């Protein structure tokens, strides 16, 4: 808290303001007297009370299992891109329903599993915690398919990333139509990491690209390069940033590699990669 008294042209003004994240020291500005009173910071955030009615239902869409044509790996969804947004939604008081492109059991990308021998995601205690819950494992084992979904039943849509979407989302007309239905109705419409591949071709009902005139993000070329070098091979069949920058009339942006970065442009919400899922969910 900073109290400032200004004396100028024989008129005295008193100003009390709150400064966040910085301290300003001013001296002898028109007779200014500065009193540093305190540097108090407060954080208050709603957390839904256990057992209270939900605020609505959010649809999360993941890739059905696939096999990478580049690496031969079994692929699907990235754990943190499901669990971190899921935690945000649940704590905010929303019910979540998980569906997939084809329905049925889902495949977790190996490197995203916190129990994987590689140790790549061993730090992901949020995913590890969900994996101990029977209801969560039941949800992964039995998803509805897209054709069973009525957008009117949900308040928002969130596309889960992973390696699978590079094969199952891009050019998926059924998913494009579903996502556009949410978007055109004004509902929050989100995609994170490789699930943003859908936006390379998705169109609105007037035939225009959904990202026309929009600022958005997705997995960066620099991040693809890092991943390729880490495993010693090319992992993805194409790169989202490279493809997005070929599109006229859209603004694709990325931040520092693997930093948490999300953008809301109207009701279109995008997150850069696996570390951006919670940030994107907060924007929903």
Please name every model-derived segment.
Residues 4-185, 198-284:
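Extended, subdomain-level signal for the structured scaffold at the beginning of enzyme domains
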Residues 189:
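Glycine- and acidic-residue-rich phosphate-binding/metal-coordinating active-site segment common to enzymes
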Residues 192-195:
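Short, thiol/selenol-centered motifs that function as redox-active sites or metal-ligating centers
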């Amino acid at each position: 808290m900073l109290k400032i008294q200004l004396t100028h042209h024989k008129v005295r003004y008193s100003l009390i303001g709150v400064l966040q994240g910085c301290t300003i020291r001013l001296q002898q500005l028109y007779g200014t007297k500065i009193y540093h009173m305190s540097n108090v910071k407060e954080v208050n955030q709603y957390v839904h009370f256990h057992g209270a009615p939900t605020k609505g239902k959010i649809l999360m869409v993941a890739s059905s299992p696939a096999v990478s044509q580049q690496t031969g790996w079994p692929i699907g969804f990235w754990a943190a891109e499901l669990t971190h947004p899921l935690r945000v939604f649940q704590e905010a008081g929303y019910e979540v329903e998980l569906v997939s492109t084809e329905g049925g059991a889902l495949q977790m990308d190996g490197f995203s599993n916190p129990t994987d021998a590689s140790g790549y995601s061993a730090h992901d205690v949020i995913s590890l915690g969900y994996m101990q819950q029977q209801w969560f494992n039941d949800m992964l084992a039995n998803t509805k398919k897209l054709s069973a979904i009525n957008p009117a039943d949900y308040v928002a849509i969130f596309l889960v990333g992973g390696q699978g979407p590079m094969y199952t989302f891009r050019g998926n007309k059924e998913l494009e139509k579903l996502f556009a239905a949410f978007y055109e109705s004004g509902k929050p419409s989100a995609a994170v990491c490789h699930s943003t591949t859908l936006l390379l071709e998705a169109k609105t009902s007037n035939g225009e690209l959904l990202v026309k005139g929009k600022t958005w993000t997705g997995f960066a070329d620099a991040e693809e390069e890092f991943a390729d070098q880490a495993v010693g091979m090319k992992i993805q069949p194409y790169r989202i940033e490279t493809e997005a920058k070929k599109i006229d009339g859209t603004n694709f942006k990325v931040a520092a590699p693997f930093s948490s970065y999300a953008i809301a442009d109207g009701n279109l919400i995008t997150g850069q990669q696996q570390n951006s899922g919670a940030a994107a969910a907060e924007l929903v």
